[in-house]
Amino acid sequence: MDNDYESPWGLSQLEAPADSQNIDSQPLNDDELGINTEVQVKRTRHVAKLDDTRMMDDKGLPALKHLCTKVNLKGNGHEVGDLGRLLDMYQMWSHDLFPKGQFKSLYPLTSKAGRTATVRGLRLAWIDEEQRKKQTADVATAVDELEDITDFRDRGRHFETEPRYSRQSEPPVETSVNVDNPDDLFVGMDSVDHRLVSDEDVDIQAEVSRREDDEDREQDVSELLEGARAQRDKDNSRSSGRLSLFDLGGSGSPSESDRGGSTLEGDIFGTGSLDPTPPPASETSTQAPAAQPPATQPPQAPAPTQPPSNQAPVKAPPQPMRQMDDLELDMLADFEPDFEDQEQHEPEPDPEDYEDDEAMAVMREMGL
């Protein structure tokens, strides 16, 4: 075992060997100590904190509130698109708030900053402001509805007290009324200023007058139509017991004309205003003069003899027809016979068209 007292470091400086003193007395270079070498110090990057001051700045929550008003959310069925629009809005806001920051670090920062008392107070103030605006709008709407109901009731009371006259009634007796404003809508409204009368009252009064005129016009037209139908039924009843057109004109047999029977043309109403048509001249010349006395009969020249083989039979000229008026043509349509297959020959006219024609004829007579 070594003796500790014999070691060089265990002795004092006086007792130490000379070799150890020579080693400690040698000078050292600066390069070896590292004094002249440059030391690079890394500077820590300053990260802006999301505190209350930055959140209340113009680029903070006020800017976010302004951006929310510009976002158009479509709602049901467009959830994915609405989420993309919200993310774009928050990304723009975070870029203005932290120009060199990352969007991934936005959520933890905003979540921590939203728990402060200042931000909570600002959010509650915004909620109260929106509720007050909504309540004010509801109250204004209720007041407007109440005013409309009151105005409608006032107009209803005025219409009940105001006398109404139709075109067929007698005109009212004119009385002298003191009118303050010549522009008043109703006569007798002295206490109402003409500037307080709205355009809606004028439109209502014009609509009431127009409807009254339409009702009176329809009543006049219906009365004229009823009179025309009654006259037509009366004419049909008068002509039902008279001769029809199928028993007149060319329907008679030649024997009846030889017996001297007179035929009538167009006298289907039995008025007797039409004279019987005389027989043609060709028929009177061919009749035998046996009914006349021989003394009064003038001598007749003998007819020239012609060979019967070359002579063509003489035909009587056609009898001229008298043109019928519109009323007789309408009666002729009533006496036409009905065909069994009338639907196959021609379509049956619609009765509504016939009534429309009558209505148009009556309106032309009135000059409408």
From Swiss-Prot:
UniProt-recorded Gene Ontology molecular function terms? DNA binding
Q: Where is this region: Disordered?
A: 1-33, 153-358
Which InterPro entries does the annotation name?
Csm3, TIPIN/Csm3/Swi3
Q: Where is the composition biased (Polar residues)?
A: 19-28
One biological process term in Gene Ontology: replication fork processing
Please tell me where this protein is predominantly located.
nucleus
Bias-annotated ranges (Pro residues): 291-307
Q: Where is the composition biased (Acidic residues)?
A: 213-223, 326-341, 349-358
- Membrane-crossing ranges are none
Q: Where is the composition biased (Basic and acidic residues)?
A: 153-167
**Where does this protein reside within or beyond the cell?**
Nucleus
- Record-level GO cellular component terms: replication fork protection complex
Q: What are the alphabetically sorted keywords of the record?
A: Cell cycle, DNA damage, DNA repair, DNA replication inhibitor, Meiosis, Nucleus
Subunit record text: Component of the fork protection complex (FPC) consisting of TOF1 and CSM3.
For this chain, the family text in UniProt reads: Belongs to the CSM3 family.
Q: Could you tell me what this protein does?
A: Forms a fork protection complex (FPC) with TOF1 and which is required for chromosome segregation during meiosis and DNA damage repair. FPC coordinates leading and lagging strand synthesis and moves with the replication fork. FPC stabilizes replication forks in a configuration that is recognized by replication checkpoint sensors.
Q: What is this protein called?
A: Chromosome segregation in meiosis protein 3
Q: Which organism is it from?
A: Yarrowia lipolytica (strain CLIB 122 / E 150)
What is the phylogenetic placement of the source species in the record? Eukaryota, Fungi, Dikarya, Ascomycota, Saccharomycotina
